[in-house]
Amino acid sequence: MTDVPSKPPQTTPPPKPKSRAPTTIFSSPPQLPDRSSLNISHTASTPTLTPTPLQQQQIHTDGNSQQPKSSPPPLPERQSFSNSPNRQTQSFIQKPALPPRDSQYNTISGSTVFKSNNNINNNNNDSHIITNGNASTSFIQGNRVTRVLNTNKSEPILQQPQQSHSPQQQQQQHTPNHQQPLSPQQQKDLAQKRSTMPLPPRPNKNRPLPTPISPESHPLTINEENSITEDKEQQPQQSAPPQPQLQQSQQNTDNSRKPIVAPPTPTIQ
């Protein structure tokens, strides 16, 4: 028997390592720069940071290429709203400037507004607006607005007709009989009457309410009850004729819608 040579075991070749970017391994965590090294400008604009040379190298270098990148352009500075010169252009609604006010009158859209404190109604809150035929509702100052549409026509103020009477006649007309001046003797008599008249009783809040009267203690109620009971007992003993009661019940049904009630049967003794 011939010996068969044994084949050596096939060994798989090791896989080729893939090409990787060079990795930077930090032995210790990176230290942050101090606040004193950062130049921060305390203004309304965005703060501009000036990095240190070590930071600059880490920012501008990439893993694949060692060439520094171009830095981004700086942002424009922001203007605060209070310091901006064109503040009216930035607002949405531009209000027109009012004409200058005078101390005596105001001219607003062709209408003259007079401020007067001594009005007919003696109301300081009134403002009189005089327009030339234009019904304009413009509240300038106060609560009430008086519009004079036609300045050519002026209505006269209504005055009461003067009565040609002597002062004695006026006094007799206006003063009634009980308000006429009294003589000194009448005044003394009236004072004596008032002193002798008894005063009306004053209401006492602390006085208790009167107790209700029981029917047993009052004799009138007992007599009334006895008289009523006697009448009730005497009614069935009297034999009343039934015919007039029937006529009354029929008349009642004609006038009002009440049911016909049968007459009571007389008790036979």
Curated annotation (Swiss-Prot):
Q: What is this protein called?
A: Putative uncharacterized protein DDB_G0282269
In which residue ranges is the amino acid composition biased (Pro residues)? 1-16, 198-213
Q: Which cysteines are joined by disulfide bonds?
A: none
Stretches of Low complexity bias are at 46-58, 159-181
User: What is the superkingdom listed in this entry's lineage?
Assistant: Eukaryota
Residue ranges of region Disordered? 1-110, 157-269
What ranges does the record list as Polar residues composition bias? 21-45, 80-93, 182-195
